[in-house]
Amino acid sequence: VLILSYNVYTGYRLKDKMEAVEIRVDTMSSFIKDMENDIEKAIFIVGFRSLLSLEDYMMKYDKFYGIDPEDLGITFNNAFDEVFRQGTINSVTMSLMKNNTFVYWTNKMSEQANKTNIILNFTVNSVTISQTEPWMVDIKVDLRINATDKKNAASWIIDKDFTKKINITGFVDPLYLVNNDGKVNNTIRKTPINPSASTSNLETHMVNSYYIEHN
């Protein structure tokens, strides 16, 4: 009778433990899904502010991005990477990026994870910006995510490229940011008309400094 009772007790304990682990795995799985959505939102917010900061930096120093002597001494891609991650360009702190860098957002996510007994670590392998459509830029973050339950019930290692698109309409055309003493800032606005349809349309297009896509 004692042996039977022990076996039954052990069986129940094992079952309870397995159910607890299963619940924990489901909880972590839901957390990971929510976290991935938060990462995409963070990329959009940080990416948008990074583009504005790049404009501000150009206007402040009145130069284009590049490594030639007459340029800013940093390429556009490297400047974007730096400001996106750290909130600086050429080590100059950009005010728009205060509490809005990607590192800041991932640290906040790790803090939230810790409250639910999850150890969350991020490794940013690369940050790139490219233009694949006339009115959009793509922000791609190559990320490694390591999520581990504090009791070692479950763990995830995720290697993933996260990409968000940002519409560039409304941003200032970079060509107008340099060598004009801040007198002319032409924003990118998609033309609502066909400028080639008539002389009147062409005049309207030119007077309003509209933009037309060109592939």
Question: What are the language-model segments listed below?
Answer:
Residues 5-215:
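Long, compositionally biased, intrinsically disordered regions
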